[in-house]
Amino acid sequence: MRVLASCVDNGSLKEAVFGFGTDTSVQTAPQPQLIETHLCEGLDAHVEQIHKIDDGKWLLARHNGTVQYVESELVDHSEIEGMKVSHFDVVGSITGLLDVSRLDHLNAQSKRRTKLKDGFVSLAPVSKKDCYLACTKSGLVHILALNFKDKLLTKLQTFEVKAPLEFAQVYDVEKTKKTVFACGGEENLVKLFELSESCDKISMIWESKNVKNDRLDMRVPVWPVALKFLQPVPTSSAGYDKNKLNFQFLVVTGWSHFGIYNTQHGKRPMKYLDLLPEREPLRQLELLDPSHNTKAITQLGNLKCKETESLEFITTDKKTQVLKYNGQGQLIGKYGKGDITGLATYIGIHDQKYLLEGGLDRYLRVFDIESRAQKAKIYLGTNINRILVLDEELEALQEIEMAKNNKRKQTASDEEDDAEELWSKLETKKEKKRKL
């Protein structure tokens, strides 16, 4: 498996090549074939968002407010025979896309223990060809255009929405002429925005309402942190209203809630469940298709499924837990239980088979989705906040590993033969001495 990870401490991308069974925490276990560092720009410019446009074409959004267009290719490694390594070139960039001053007035109201910092919460394609949405925590929505011929990245428009934002999830379950995306954050209710086909206008088309007060008649705090879309309700279903918007989506919150929304049903969630006992904050949301249909998951992680009861999802808390639930909010199991020792800052799903995890304990891990067994564990020496699989390459790596193992076995066998030959010579000498 060839993997690319965004590393916070030095602002680099690290490329790792390894086979299943790799574990750098065990000396006798197989080790990575390659760990290579690329595009190192320092802590203040670490990569926050990565979007793969096509093979060898990338957009990177960095913590210093820069978005880069990067091209890559596989070349022969200069030192390891038979090994390929990626070569990255920054061919276009645009700077100055953050504005932390828009967050200053929110710091006094925030429940966070640290000061709010601006950064990118989303980087995704929109309906207009070769245009991309880059959203920031401070509520800036940038529309970027990429000219592949001239390798030029430009900013077309900037819109402002209410801050702070934890996410900006683009709807890609169906093809639409206009781009719809959802956003929200701390004390910022989920809103749906529509971007015009020409990307020159933006309008809010729907806003959620908070749930009713709890059993003590206390207001339930608002803090959506992640959202994923589902397929809309069929137009043939009972109660369908053509005059209402038709979107379904799932939300997890910073107060441990899991919400299921249907805009046909109303502005409040259809279900709003507590997942953790003491309202511990949740951070991320990744959807699974129970039928393991890879085509059911879109490029942006949304799910082409109408039924919420049959789906499964994975989320993380702000400690060390990576948790798998079903659509009813029932815990199925945990990944890396007892092994993950730091906050999981990133989880991602590859091909509906593997869960990629990285975090503050500086390890990149790969788990089997179904069995939750750990398939690989690689120490990268830095905090990790994004992971992408470039290609699996399992067969080649297994052949390399088998060749190494055969070589070790052959060496061990040769050593045993040499030892036996030496002992037989010594025994022969002893017998000759006795005869004399």
UniProtKB/Swiss-Prot annotation:
Nucleus among keywords: yes
Organism per entry: Candida glabrata (strain ATCC 2001 / BCRC 20586 / JCM 3761 / NBRC 0622 / NRRL Y-65 / CBS 138)
Family membership: Belongs to the NSA1 family.
Subcellular location: Nucleus, Nucleolus
Encoding gene, per UniProt annotation: NSA1
Name recorded for this polypeptide: Ribosome biogenesis protein NSA1
A single cellular component GO annotation: nucleolus
Main localization, broad class: nucleus
Keywords, alphabetical: Nucleus, Ribosome biogenesis, rRNA processing
CDD domains named among the record's database cross-references: Nsa1
Function field: Involved in the biogenesis of the 60S ribosomal subunit.
Presence of keyword rRNA processing: yes
Gene Ontology biological process terms in this record: ribosomal large subunit biogenesis; rRNA processing
Region: Disordered, residue numbers: 405-436
InterPro entries in UniProt: WD40_repeat_dom_sf, WDR74/Nsa1
PANTHER family: NOP SEVEN ASSOCIATED PROTEIN 1, WD REPEAT-CONTAINING PROTEIN 74
Summary of subunit composition and partner proteins: Component of the pre-66S ribosomal particle.
